[in-house]
């Protein structure tokens, strides 16, 4: 398998006046193309901070992240935004759908931002919503959808640009257990079909066990890597 992402000695220090808090401490790991990986650990262990750095949403204080052919820290802000739009997908505990837009409009948005025509964007969004089982709900707004349906829309939006990697931060945290299992099964199915890699932060050990590999974070350190 080919290396998709390489994280080398990544540290993150937050400074406020003369006080420093080291949130990440020399994190090292690699992610292969098409892998399905969970990151687990207690609250405050650095999981979400690591995900933000891997997604070029924040900068490491020390260390390097290589993604595809890019050294993320060497890119301009505009180039980082382009990489996020074209090669990365994001899913969060809260769906972050735009309330005034329908499901299909929300899913089409990244394509429109990336320069696709409205017709191309709509067709691609409709195809993905059908794939996640929402063909009958695509013209509904988020307020008209259940929690599980909203998260399916968020997953479709994350995948619409056919990213190499999806970063998911507690994607089932607001869902009941049955719906959470359905969302994880959907992510695994889409992973098999598209070859998109998933890196998922979760507190749920049962759901993490469904992944190909589990990374354990503790006090800002990658404590173990179980394949």
Swiss-Prot record:
Entry binding sites for ATP: 41-48
GO terms under biological process: lipoprotein localization to membrane
Alphabetical list of Pfam families matching this protein: ABC_tran (PF00005)
Gene3D superfamilies linked: P-loop containing nucleotide triphosphate hydrolases
Cellular component annotations (GO), alphabetically ordered: plasma membrane
Transmembrane portions of the chain: none
Record domain ABC transporter: where: 5-227
SUBUNIT field: The complex is composed of two ATP-binding proteins (LolD) and two transmembrane proteins (LolC and LolE).
Family statement drawn from the similarity comment of this UniProt entry: Belongs to the ABC transporter superfamily. Lipoprotein translocase (TC 3.A.1.125) family.
Descriptive protein name: Lipoprotein-releasing system ATP-binding protein LolD
Lineage: Bacteria, Pseudomonadati, Pseudomonadota, Gammaproteobacteria, Vibrionales
């Amino acid at each position: 398998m080919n290396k998709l992402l390489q994280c080398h000695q990544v540290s993150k220090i937050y400074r406020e006046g003369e006080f420093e808090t080291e949130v990440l401490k020399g994190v090292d790991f690699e992610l292969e193309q098409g892998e399905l990986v969970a990151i687990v650990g207690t609250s405050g262990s650095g999981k979400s901070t690591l995900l933000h750095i891997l997604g070029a949403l924040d900068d490491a204080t020390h260390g390097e992240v290589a993604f595809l052919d890019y050294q993320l820290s060497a890119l301009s802000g505009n180039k980082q935004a382009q990489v996020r739009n074209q090669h990365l997908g994001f899913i969060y505990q809260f769906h972050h759908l735009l309330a005034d837009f329908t499901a299909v409009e929300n899913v089409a948005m990244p394509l429109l931002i990336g320069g696709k025509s409205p017709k191309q964007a709509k067709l691609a969004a409709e195809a993905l919503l059908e794939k996640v089982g929402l063909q009958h709900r695509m013209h509904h707004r988020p307020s008209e959808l259940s929690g599980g349906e909203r998260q399916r829309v968020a997953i479709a939006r994350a995948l619409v640009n056919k990213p190499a990697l999806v970063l998911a931060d507690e994607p089932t945290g607001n869902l009941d257990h049955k719906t959470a299992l359905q969302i994880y099964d959907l992510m695994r199915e889409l992973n098999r079909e598209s070859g998109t890699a998933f890196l998922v932060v979760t507190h749920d050990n049962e759901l993490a066990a469904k992944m190909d590999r589990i990374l354990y974070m503790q006090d800002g350190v990658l404590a173990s890597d179980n394949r």
